[in-house]
Amino acid sequence: MSLTKAERTMVVSIWGKISMQADAVGTEALQRLFSSYPQTKTYFPHFDLHEGSPQLRAHGSKVAAAVGDAVKSIDNVAGALAKLSELHAYILRVDPVNFKFLSHCLLVTLASRLPADFTADAHAAWDKFLSIVSSVLTEKYR
């Protein structure tokens, strides 16, 4: 699966509009993840998962940084996220379905923060992009 030029442009444009709030976006997406899919909390037994906790904000920043890296390297997402893929597959052993859950939460967060810009086409482009990101993050499982 690959993005068309128009889809790449939409993904980069949306990220450009949200990048100044990227850490908050990552944190909000994680909060949505833990609220909607409470089973994902098992990967963070040592975290204070209450809204606004320093640990939640720190990990939200990491999520946002990874998405930002993928956007910056939109033509080579696999290269940009190779180390993160290995970490999640071999060390953290995160169930691959959780990346799809997080992708959904990121879509909802982007839509809620950019209602005028997150059109149906932008949603479709971001959904496809996050599917690529999820695929890259789970490719080491095979």
Swiss-Prot record:
GO cellular component, one term: hemoglobin complex
Keyword Metal-binding: yes
GO molecular function list: heme binding; iron ion binding; oxygen binding; oxygen carrier activity
Boundaries of every Globin domain copy: 2-142
CDD domains (UniProt xref): Hb-alpha-like
Biological process according to GO: cellular oxidant detoxification; erythrocyte maturation; hydrogen peroxide catabolic process; negative regulation of transcription by RNA polymerase II
Sites bearing Phosphoserine, chain numbering: 53, 73
InterPro entries: Globin (IPR000971), Globin-like_sf (IPR009050), Globin/Proto (IPR012292), Hemoglobin_a-typ (IPR002338), Hemoglobin_oxygen_transport (IPR050056), Hemoglobin_zeta (IPR002340)
Keywords: Acetylation, Heme, Iron, Metal-binding, Oxygen transport, Phosphoprotein, Transport
Chain positions recorded as heme b binding sites: 59, 88
Subunit composition and interactions: Heterotetramer of two zeta chains and beta-type chains.
Protein name in UniProt: Hemoglobin subunit zeta
Gene: HBZ1
